[in-house]
Amino acid sequence: MAGKLRVHELAKELGVTSKELLATLKEQGEFVKTASSTVQPPVVKKMKKHYGVGEESAKESATTPSPAAKPGPKPAAKAAPKAAAKPGPKPGPKPGPQPVKNTNPVAGAGTRPTSTVKPGEKPAPKPGAKPAPKTAAKPTPKPGAKPGPKPGGAKPGAKPGPKPGGRAPRVANNPFSSGAPAERPAPRPRGGQAGPGDMPRPGSRPGGAKKAGPKPGGAKQGGGRRPSPAMMPSHPNPAQMPSKSDNFGGGRGRGGRHGGPGGPGGPGGPGGPRGGRGGRRGGTAGAFGRPGGAPRKGRKSKRQKRNEYEAMQAPSVVGGVKLPNGKGAKIRLARGASLMDFAEKIKADAAALVQALFNLGEMVTATQSVSDETLMLLGEEMDYKVEVVSPEDEDRELLESFDLQFGEDEGEDEDLAQRPPVVTVMGHVDHGKTRLLDTIRKANVGSGEAGGITQHIGAYQVSVSMEGEDRLVTFLDTPGHEAFTAMRARGAKSTDIAILVVAADDGVMPQTVEAINHAKAADIPVVVAVNKIDKEGAQPDKIRGQLTEYGLIPEEYGGETMFVDISAKQGTNIDQLLESVLLTADASLDLRANPDMDAQGVAIEAHLDRGRGPVATIIVQRGTLRVGDSIVVGDAYGRVRRMIDEHGNDVQEAGPSRPVQVLGLTSVSGAGDNLLVVDEDRTARQIADRRDARRRNALAARSRKRVSLEDLDSVLKETNTLNLILKGDNAGTVEALEDALLKIEVDDEVDLNIIDRGVGAVTETNVNLAAASDAVIIGFNVRAEGKATEVANAEGVDIRYYSIIYKAIEEVEAALKGMLKPIYEEKQIGTAEIRQIFKASSVGLIAGCMVETGKVRRNAQARLVRDGNVVAEKTTIESLRREKDDVTEVSAGYECGMVLSYPDIQVDDIIEVFELVEVPRT
């Protein structure tokens, strides 16, 4: 067949249904969708070969019987009823002229059995010289008869006549054969046609042999039983097809013996007397006289092997989209990765992943960050094990890609030198932490703090004299307010020893317990300073007993924790406290670092200075930081232009445990970010850009909310959202304010959304963003600059300024509560009983009532009750009269007439009058 065919056209040509052909094509590994799909010519040829049609369409004229040769010899007429499904009176049954699906375009359904003619030999003038004496039950034509007039015989060049019983022309008379006839494959038996070996040709078994000998085509012939029209499948069933050896002597049935060398079949019948496995064709002759292939063994065919291989390599189908099959492979993705990153890992098209997620009900773009759950779900669908890398591991891998490492000293043990201990002062708010540092530094830090509370981390290095030797100690002062949890945790991670300050007159408080937990999590030793022992009501022993419950057991009680009773205000026992700190450091810690390596440290604070730009407070942990070094701090990078110590003096280099302020960064770093010195500015910029992209992706993935069917109803409801823009004087304060605001829990009806935050003054850009998003700007220790105030007034943007953090928290919480939908409570005003009903043409029914309790007011809401059942829940008193006067209210004990908005009223009904009072939300 030239050109392409559609599936339904090919099915019609093959004589099967489109559904069966589609199933066969899919079994063969050809992916077609519908019956209208086109099929390539090689596939058409393969399907014709599979269904045993071959080139029948091209040879139709050779196989179509002619109605001119109906009469046939009588033996054929007797054999036909045996082989046909329905016996007919004529020797040639009606199904004979029907087209036969046959791989042999010349031979018909009744191809002559056991005729073996080798190529190159002259065919014998008679197909056989002997009749089969053992199987013959009826007379057969004489062997000397001429082959020309035999039924089904076709002379060269002449049209073949009708073949009684569906007999095929003699092989020697094949008009398409150029030489000696070759072996032909057996046709498929059809209903009403004689099977192989049934034709009463000379030299073959006569049709009556079925009564005495083995049944041709039966179980003993090696090709399975003869199919009947009722048993015929829609396409060839290998288990029931006759073996090729039933038709030609050169064939061989599966498991049977070779047939005879030609002429009539032996006593066992062609193909061997034993029953072989049906379904597999033997080694048969090729078409048009070409030699056939070797017989198949019990091994798998190439087609089967290919199908198995394709099944193993079959792609995964996710949401109707073909995607690679991971086969359990593990891939690592960063938190907040996009589908583009996923596609790059698995060598797939990102558009296919987008389409797959869209079909699964998730609408994302290729570059949009997706949540960890979505990445894992998509990986499971494709048989990939997705591992979401933690930020710490991802940052370590990022540094390793640049051949950098953070957190370990370089060099040998002899390269390490002693460094000062880093001590963090922690405790509850207003327990005297900053006063203690003031006393140690002999300075007044607390007076500069708004509200008398510390709102950022201070880093100082002081010299302490111990046993006649001056030693340096670095102190970190952390906030004690509950809003600064992240700062205290960051201070604990950056320190060697913690001083826990507890007021002797106040005892253990919530932030005290939190500080203990931070110290335990960081695995650092704790020295307890019991402060305010000079005040009345101080109970140092009670403090020791309370802290015992949290694992801090004093040395006098047999524990390992040093307790020192001090008075920061009076300066009592301060030297003893410092000595205890140094003793703990010497006894418990190995405080050494390599000062000769590239500097590494941590940023404990960062802010934006108007004249100096971004400023970061750094504690060097190892190595030496010098002016001019290229540094990267989190997602900020730059070159050290200037370093300032705690006294405001410039320093050229800072060794281990030295706190300094660093100028020269391109942006404000995050509090708690690691500092790293690199060789080139380009490397620093690349690391910072990668970190910034990772941070933004993680933030986008965290802010995306997945909506399920369960919470769809609540999402569709109207939700009030308070949008905020936070600006502060330093990064730590902004971080603490954001954490505190996000912890406010009011109700599900309102939501708090922080759309932007930053360090520095409120700019015009912030005001424009607030105007576009209907947000409120909160400035903490900063003011608006330039034209920001004018633009805010013109746009109606609300800017709030705060210097104390808990005041900002209280006002934001109050604003959220004000956004809640009001709750109304019903308050009963009075009741009235209907005594009589009057009819008025202008207003309808008028209820003549007696006010029993309270008052009845005009336009008030009322409830109509009849026999204890509520008849009308919400009705209104439209008109109220006392005698003939319109009144606004009538008190108890008086009669009145009223008109209700609900007309169905009866005598003895009770009217309950009430009003709705708004209840404030808390």
From Swiss-Prot:
Give me the ranges of the annotated region G2: 452-456
Q: Name one GO cellular component term.
A: cytosol
| Region spans: G4 | 531-534
Q: Where does GTP bind?
A: 427-434, 477-481, 531-534
Give its localization.
Cytoplasm
**Sequence segments annotated as region (G3):** 477-480
What are the Pro residues biased-composition ranges? 88-98, 140-150
Described function? One of the essential components for the initiation of protein synthesis. Protects formylmethionyl-tRNA from spontaneous hydrolysis and promotes its binding to the 30S ribosomal subunits. Also involved in the hydrolysis of GTP during the formation of the 70S ribosomal complex.
Family statement: Belongs to the TRAFAC class translation factor GTPase superfamily. Classic translation factor GTPase family. IF-2 subfamily.
* Name used for this protein in its record: Translation initiation factor IF-2
Query: What organism does the UniProt record list as the source?
Result: Corynebacterium jeikeium (strain K411)
- Per UniProt, what is the name of the gene that codes for the protein in this document? infB
